[in-house]
Amino acid sequence: MRSLILAAALVITSFASGALAEGKRIGVAWGDFQEARWRWDATAMRSMIERNGNKYIPTNAGGSAEQQLRDIEKLVSEGIDALIIQPVDKEAIGPGVDRAAAAGVPILGYDRMIEDERVFYLTFDNVGVGRLIAAIVKQVQPEGNYAIILGDPSDANSTFLRQGMEEIIGAAVAGGQITIVGEANADGWKPENAKAVMEKILADSGNKVDAVLAQNDGMAGAAIEALTSAGLSVPVGGQDGDKAALNRVAQGLQTVSVWKNNFDLAKRAGQIAGLLADGTPMNLIPDAKQFTGGEKGIPVWAILLTPTPVTAENLDVVIDADHVTKQDVCKGAMPSVAACR
């Protein structure tokens, strides 16, 4: 009897070891966790990777392009089967891509484009995000002095977002209905840099700003701080669906936050990385299409998901999706916000 139990235990142990051996090692080179959304993404991504029986191996470069290259070198040397990169700098990441590709490791660029045919690109339609930010702010403020706060100049997303904004406001700028009184990048997408940009625009324009297009919610919040200090309350648009931004929408401080359902994005990344690790060619990833919208026009295989604009009129969308709680979103909300009643 004892020998039977021992034999059974050996079989179970052998099976468990075999199951673990079958799992793939998915390295994730995060650029930073400055924005709350990246921390949410990491949780959802890890959940999907582990649900599929694979191992999640993360690094965090803390906003340093040099550190991210070291992180990728370390991940590749540890024998990962697939690599997800949220690049700090789309150009500086090149040697990291070369290193991973030389080792035969498939690569997924996460929400920030790496314009390289060896890298699968997963993101939202960022040109569409730019359109939504500008369109909703323009509905509220169809003319006047606009300030535009761009993201980091090394991030292709900033270019895509600006392209979308231009599609909405370009004709009004050409026709003189809208005047851009200031436009500048906030290095690293950092709120403190965005606040400095906004303060300079206010100083240069004599506080004559009627609307602000910010390329993410952290920068929108920083712009609102500067506007408030100047005694101004104007339409401000951003994106990411950050909890603080959605609360500002409920309070009437921010006009729109374009929500990119990052849980879906992160889970999809975990799924795709698993497929790539298993040897699935990029062109056979479900829903993949060729994308040539980068600065160099290099064709890459990509999936672009659809974003959702969130205003005071439809805050229930993010609450019902369990993205945020009603309690968090509705603190100090305007009485007119139906989702907060």
Show the residue positions of the predicted features.
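N-terminal signal peptide c-region/cleavage motif recognized by signal peptidases
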Residues: S14-G18
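A residue-level marker of the well-folded mature domains of exported/periplasmic proteins
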Residues: L20-R341
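Positively charged n-region of N-terminal signal peptides that target proteins for export
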Residues: M1-A7
